[in-house]
């Protein structure tokens, strides 16, 4: 009998991607985050779609429409908080996924890695424009501060900012276009994710050892489908716990005050997942320098494959590199903490030191230590 799964043009694509895909037999739970990101994306698109049915992208009614969703729409509060906290889960999975790639040398699949960096930037853009939509105080001032950074670009900066705003300040036109961007970007992310997967399946997955696993592959289904389902259950459990018990834990109380251009909040700060980059931005006293550092803090990921000096792909057997990797994680956590603190002593100097350490670790220390490890192994 002919198996339709292997012959039908559409089923064949799905089969080769999720069922008969040869997968290394030793990949750990750190490889779960790819599928979890897919799950997050689907959840965000679905909850977002239902929110868009009731939301109005107009400065006079946006805040009220979000209140209306929470009060009057059936399970509207649940959909809204699933969407808001779903974004946090998305970024947790995203950072874990990138961390896994850095630790195990997955960045050596350069096409996959570069599409991944592009995906990160697109998700960050989506989260930023989405945060503006409830039109609370932090929405308005966050949009004002972050879009204003573009004015640091020489010559065209001011014109560019006014072009993005659609006027001379963040107003009705800005909110409308941000809603349009927030609606379209997830579909672009979906397309990019498909390309990301396409490139990955050209090479096959990496594994914790970093050694080619062509001679030891197992089918994706049932081994990793069941493992992914377990991961998905944990993710959903965490998301539901957050949404039902502490929906506002990760949010900002200022966003429950309607946007007011005449009153600036005491501390303007983005959502927690952008705080590390915000801390790097603030650590440089010069506007253009800060913007460049902010950009480089993310775009530095593109250069990681070029900074690989070790003759081993993974950090599994490299204790000194492991130490530096976890120092980098600690540094990023420090930056995240600093980003949420007011601009005063001692936070300023701690932020500056953490920012310097971030770039020094990636650009200097890690490549140097990799070379030393090669020497120690007489390679």
Curated annotation (Swiss-Prot):
Subcellular location: Mitochondrion inner membrane
Cofactor(s) demanded: heme b
Ranges that cross the membrane: 33-53, 77-98, 113-133, 178-198, 226-246, 288-308, 320-340, 347-367
Alphabetized GO MF terms: metal ion binding; ubiquinol-cytochrome-c reductase activity
UniProt cross-references to InterPro entries, sorted A to Z: Cyt_b/b6_C (IPR005798), Cyt_b/b6_C_sf (IPR036150), Cyt_b/b6_N (IPR005797), Cytb/b6-like_sf (IPR027387), Cytochrome_b (IPR030689), Cytochrome_b_C_euk/bac (IPR048260), Cytochrome_b_N_euk/bac (IPR048259), Di-haem_cyt_TM (IPR016174)
Assembly notes: The cytochrome bc1 complex contains 11 subunits: 3 respiratory subunits (MT-CYB, CYC1 and UQCRFS1), 2 core proteins (UQCRC1 and UQCRC2) and 6 low-molecular weight proteins (UQCRH/QCR6, UQCRB/QCR7, UQCRQ/QCR8, UQCR10/QCR9, UQCR11/QCR10 and a cleavage product of UQCRFS1). This cytochrome bc1 complex then forms a dimer.
A biological-process GO annotation: mitochondrial electron transport, ubiquinol to cytochrome c
Residue sites binding heme b b562 per the record: 83, 182
Gene label: MT-CYB
Provenance organism: Cephalorhynchus heavisidii (Heaviside's dolphin)
Function: Component of the ubiquinol-cytochrome c reductase complex (complex III or cytochrome b-c1 complex) that is part of the mitochondrial respiratory chain. The b-c1 complex mediates electron transfer from ubiquinol to cytochrome c. Contributes to the generation of a proton gradient across the mitochondrial membrane that is then used for ATP synthesis.
Keyword Kinase: no
Protein name: Cytochrome b
Any one annotated GO CC term: mitochondrial inner membrane
Cross-referenced SUPFAM superfamilies: a domain/subunit of cytochrome bc1 complex (Ubiquinol-cytochrome c reductase), Transmembrane di-heme cytochromes
Binding site for a ubiquinone: 201
